[in-house]
Amino acid sequence: MSDASHRFCIAPMMDWTDTHCRVLHRMLTRHARLYTEMVTAEAVIRGDRQRLLAFDAVEHPVALQLGGAEPERLAEAARIGASFGYDEINLNVGCPSDRVQSGRFGACLMREPELVADCLAAMRAAVAVPVTVKCRIGVDDQDPEHSLRALVARCVAAGVTTFAVHARKAWLQGLSPRENRDVPPLDYDLVLAVKRENPALTILLNGGIATLDDAALHLTRFDGVMLGRAAYQNSQILADIDRRFFQGEARSVEDAVSDYVGYVEEQLARGAPLNAMTKHLLGMFNARPGARLFRRHLSENATRPGAGVAVLREALAHVMPHAMQAA
């Protein structure tokens, strides 16, 4: 394997895995590898780099996911990303959204494995950190038995050895991005076959992994797993990752959230809005007593002008009253 932290990864998720989300996840697990939201190469090159790329040092190991289809632009974006200190640069070959397709990148690149390889070769030549791929098994009417193998072969020829594979096809027309996460059937066996045909590669399985028990089962056959929606829909499960998969200690959810309160205070002092940070807590206490009141309090109050850390403390009193009394 290329890195021990690839054993358990938290997937890049648009509109979700920003730096605040990643800091929270790091407070729950010290060892899992974190990924940014996808950032387009053009945004990196022409946009506000500090806003798009800056991250907290506690996030390491953390990967930057790029979107694009022009080798030279991706190479420049990768170079800029590496200068910010990211541990890995990942190319998005899996997002099926119309907006991404219109830029000729994301999942539609499954149809152009030679171009993907050219992009990766340029990126690898530009940076010293590992360059990796996140992909689907195919798109639309492609035969996944061929499309996945063709992509992997081209990427390997370009020097890439780590693949995060969402074990579903993507339908570029007729399904929304949300539907593309559920409707196309999973084909774990195909991804496993590719792993067995390429034992030296690091293959991370993504798609349909909802619990740590699911992850443990897949880790008997794959090098790593990549957890998506469950990481924010039921964030508390992340607290047991280190114990189960890295021979570390489980983290108390209460301790992690208490640490996050301190982070929120620091960010508020720097001008960040409260709701930008509290939205990442909404899935933390699922099925716990007081969870509904916690979510309601945040939803009703965190977006109010001038909302401060007191709003968060009041909400947390519904789910972890003893910790809030001690604070």
Functional labels for PLM-detected ranges:
Residues 43-52, 97-127, 172-192, 213, ...:
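Active-site-adjacent beta->alpha loops and helix N-cap segments on the catalytic face
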Residues 40, 68, 95-97, 137-141, ...:
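Active-site-proximal loop/turn and secondary-structure-junction residues that shape catalytic pockets
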